[in-house]
């Protein structure tokens, strides 16, 4: 009886130590697509059908046309909220001005930095998670996450012109696996230059366990253009090539990947 009592006490003691470490360290739980991504989408400037742009003109009244060119901004922001924010559904929700200040406070953190301890994160009361809050307060988020226009002038975008070989994709694949293995996230710039079938940023957040018979590796992707479900990226070791799934705004097929926000000037 005494032995069992000591065993129970030891379990409580270890659980307490774990909670203290989580509160005081940069522990970061795995990203949940349904909880930790935005409820609103980044809209394409053009209208698409079967992955190809059409000549059909978008109307000013089209609600999907109001928030565009933010794929980099939204992918980066999901990383920042995952690392530097926490939610408290028990407290009263902030007014628009207070919420805007806290969103900008999160956006000022370097996305490549280590996750903050829970007690040092920016707190967002009134909501359980990012998905819930961004659905209820969409306009405040869209006004304060940052400019999409500025992402066109990121210095590392130039890699698509001169880093186009398979050796570079091998290195990127290794960096991707290393990032996911240590519990980090990986913002990916997708390009098919000199073809222009895709010029886009997404967030790779998990790898499917195991391999297919061909050795193909599968990854789960948050795509800011598609908020309803994760997308899939694959890596073929034989061809040393990434492939992104077909969608309404992409024909599907091989893409080159360049990591973004993994370090300064990237």
Question: What kind of region is each of these model predictions?
Answer:
Residues 2-14:
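Bacterial N-terminal signal peptides that target proteins for export
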Residues 12-23:
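Bacterial N-terminal signal peptides
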Residues 24-28:
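Sec/Tat signal peptide C-region and signal peptidase I cleavage site
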Residues 29, 195-199, 208-266:
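Cys-His-centered catalytic/binding microenvironment captured across papain-like cysteine peptidases
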Residues 31-167:
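Cysteine-nucleophile protease catalytic domains, especially the papain-like/related folds used
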Residues 70-72, 185, 199-202, 216-218:
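Extracellular structured ligand-interaction cores
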Residues 158-174, 261-266:
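Exposed acidic/polar residues on beta-strands and adjacent loops within beta-sheet cores, strongest
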Residues 164-210:
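Active-site-adjacent substructure of cysteine-protease-like catalytic cores
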């Amino acid at each position: 009886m005494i032995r069992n009592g000591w065993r129970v006490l030891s379990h409580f003691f270890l659980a307490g130590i774990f909670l203290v470490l989580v509160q005081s360290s940069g522990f970061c739980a795995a990203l949940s697509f349904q909880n930790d991504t935005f409820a609103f989408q980044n809209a394409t400037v053009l209208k698409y059908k079967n992955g190809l742009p059409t000549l059909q003109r978008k109307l000013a009244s089209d609600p999907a046309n109001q928030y565009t060119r933010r794929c980099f901004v939204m992918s980066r922001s999901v990383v920042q909220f995952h690392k530097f924010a926490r939610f408290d559904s028990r407290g009263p929700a902030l007014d628009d001005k207070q919420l805007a200040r806290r969103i900008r406070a999160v956006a000022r953190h370097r996305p490549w930095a280590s996750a903050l301890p829970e007690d040092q994160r920016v707190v967002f009361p009134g909501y359980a998670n990012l998905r819930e809050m961004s659905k209820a307060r969409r306009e405040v988020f869209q006004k304060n996450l940052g400019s999409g226009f500025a992402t066109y002038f990121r210095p590392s975008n130039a890699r698509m012109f001169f880093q186009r070989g398979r050796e570079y994709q091998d290195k990127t694949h290794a960096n991707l696996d290393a990032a996911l293995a240590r519990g980090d996230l990986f913002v990916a710039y997708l390009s098919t230059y000199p073809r222009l079938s895709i010029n886009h940023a997404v967030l790779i957040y998990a790898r499917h366990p195991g391999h297919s018979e061909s050795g193909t590796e599968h990854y789960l992707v948050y795509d800011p253009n598609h908020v309803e479900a994760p997308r899939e990226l694959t890596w073929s070791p034989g061809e040393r090539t990434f492939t992104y799934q077909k969608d309404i705004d992409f024909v599907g097929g091989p893409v080159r990947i360049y990591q973004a926000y993994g370090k300064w000037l990237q």
